[in-house]
Design a protein with these regions (language model features):
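Start-of-helix register in tetratricopeptide repeats
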Residues: 13-14, 47-49, 83-84, 130, ...
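Conserved small/polar residues in nucleotide/adenosyl-binding loops
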Residues: 1-5
Length: 182
């Protein structure tokens, strides 16, 4: 089963302009250098944004262990915690096959999304990604994590809940059929 990952490089809204520009241009060496400078700032907010930018730089290079470490430092340093950050942390953990940690990040992100939703669809301002689409991705990946952990009952339950919400997802339909054999 594939991991859903629809995330696009974000603008890293509050990071150093040159780091963001380098990241968007695909100049990861320069982006990394700029964001590392930002992590050394005495201002915790700037430092946290530096770690977030560094995490995105590693993520874009598919260096998931380094990305996850940088995301953790960003959270520990006080970056504004968003559903997107927890989604990316979950994806990084999945890519490194740490499904227990991935499940924790995904569930934290989903809980955050539930408290953030005010009944109307909100746009994720960091990269224009619709929050509803990201939540769908996280719910899908939650099923994957349970499956990888061989927690068949929770995988079946979450797949069933997912299909009620997203009945058009044929990949999950096939997955639910597979899970019924477990």
């Amino acid at each position: 089963m594939c991991i859903r990952d629809r995330t696009v490089a974000s603008g890293c809204a509050n990071s150093a302009k040159s780091g963001v520009e380098a990241l968007e241009a695909g100049d990861y060496k320069e982006a990394q250098a700029q964001f590392e400078k930002l992590t050394e700032e005495k201002d915790k907010k700037k430092s946290a944004e530096g770690y977030r930018g560094l995490a995105m730089t590693y993520y874009e290079q598919e260096e998931y262990t380094s990305a996850l470490d940088a995301f953790k430092k960003a959270v520990d340093t006080g970056v504004v915690q968003t559903t997107q950050i927890y989604n990316l942390m979950g994806i990084c953990a999945m890519k490194t096959e740490d499904y227990e940690a991935a499940l924790e990040y995904i569930q934290a992100g989903l809980a955050m999304a539930e408290t953030d939703m005010s009944g109307e669809e909100e746009k994720n301002s960091e990269n224009g990604k619709d929050s509803a689409e990201m939540i769908q991705e996280m719910r899908y990946n939650e099923v994957v994590c349970y499956e990888k952990l061989a927690d068949w009952e929770n995988a079946k339950q979450k797949a069933s809940e997912y299909l009620i919400e997203y009945p058009e997802d044929t990949a999950m339909e096939r997955e639910a059929e597979f899970l019924e054999t477990r």
